[in-house]
């Protein structure tokens, strides 16, 4: 008696019935809604980082895997050039860049070993050296096959993430809010997003992405999947302020109280508005031009599209000054050659003006 289940047993139980636990949570919130404790029309969103118990030195980085995998493919290509011409031509064209699979490499190695074993015994010294070299090539092909399989497995585990921990493959390396050393060290963890109303948690979700900005829309969609509707009012801090999120809220008719990302910086007592920042330039909406601190008109010269990490396309209008030569404010304004060019994101500037 008095035996306690260890953490592995508890974790296995949670993994086995996680769908049922999620359904029970939803039913409890719906019961609170039926009793009038929450309305599900208002949601306060915030996030926090939860550190994993995984070892912080068990990281796997996407860039490292992709770089080493590319080097390995080059080694394989060079190695195949040494293989018997008939086998090389049968399996691949070494003059063309192609993707090899671990299975292909294992088959090449096996075929090469079979071809070597079928040869008759020879006493020719040069022929012996050639066969010995081919045997070595076959072993290296098999070795490269295993390594390529390992890299492919890393990429499959990574998915769309940039890192993961070997001892907790669901954890992603990210900077935590509590940084005792103050050196920005990344640790394995999770980005937990929580929605509340009336001090009750109404929704939650874990994300591998450390940036709150990129988790907001998926979190809103999880709310809709759970309750078959979106809240009519959203409240969130400046970590969620982005053009993509503002557009999402506007398109779905949601009343938003989401601060733009520079809101808290501008509220500091010592904050002084920089007149040379492009967003502080006077803008004539009717005639579509900006005015620099020197009073010179900056006419629109086109627009540029920027693709964000989430795939969202942001359009930015570009404006150029007519003549910056000899301007006494130029050293404070910009350091590039030619006339200054600025970009304006109309949606973000509109949101900043509201708040």
Name each model feature, range by range.
Residues 3-355:
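Anion-binding and metal-coordination hotspots
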């Amino acid at each position: 008696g008095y035996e306690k289940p260890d953490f592995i047993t508890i974790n296995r139980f949670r993994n086995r019935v996680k769908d049922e636990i999620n359904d029970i949570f939803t039913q409890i919130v719906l019961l609170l809604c039926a009793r009038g404790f929450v309305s599900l029309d208002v949601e306060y969103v915030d996030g926090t980082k939860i550190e994993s118990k995984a070892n912080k030195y068990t990281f796997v980085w996407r860039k490292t895997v992709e770089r080493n995998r590319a080097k390995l493919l080059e080694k394989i290509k060079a190695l195949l050039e040494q293989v018997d011409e008939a086998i090389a031509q049968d399996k691949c064209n070494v003059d063309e860049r192609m993707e090899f699979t671990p299975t292909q490499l294992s088959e090449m190695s096996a075929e090469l070993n079979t071809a070597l074993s079928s040869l008759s015994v020879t006493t020719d010294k040069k022929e012996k050296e050639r066969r010995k070299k081919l045997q070595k090539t076959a072993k290296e092909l098999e070795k490269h096959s295993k390594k390529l399989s390992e890299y492919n497995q890393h990429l499959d585990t990574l998915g769309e993430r940039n890192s993961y921990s070997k001892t907790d493959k669901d954890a992603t390396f990210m900077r935590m809010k509590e940084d005792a050393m103050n050196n920005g060290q990344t640790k394995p963890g999770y980005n937990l997003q929580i929605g509340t109303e009336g001090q009750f948690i109404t929704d939650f979700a874990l994300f591998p992405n450390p940036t709150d900005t990129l988790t907001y829309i998926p979190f809103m969609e999880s709310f809709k999947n759970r309750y078959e509707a979106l809240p009519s009012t959203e409240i969130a801090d400046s970590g969620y302020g982005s053009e993509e999120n503002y557009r999402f809220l506007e398109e779905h008719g949601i009343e938003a109280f989401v601060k733009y990302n520079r809101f808290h910086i501008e509220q500091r007592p010592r904050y002084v508005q920089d007149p040379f920042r492009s967003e502080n330039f006077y803008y004539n909406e009717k005639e579509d031009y900006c005015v620099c601190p020197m009073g010179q008109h900056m006419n629109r010269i086109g627009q540029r599209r920027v693709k964000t990490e989430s795939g969202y396309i942001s359009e930015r209008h570009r404006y150029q000054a007519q003549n910056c030569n000899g301007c006494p404010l130029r050293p404070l304004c910009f350091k590039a050659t030619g006339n200054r060019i600025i970009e304006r994101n109309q949606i973000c500037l509109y949101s900043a003006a509201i708040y």
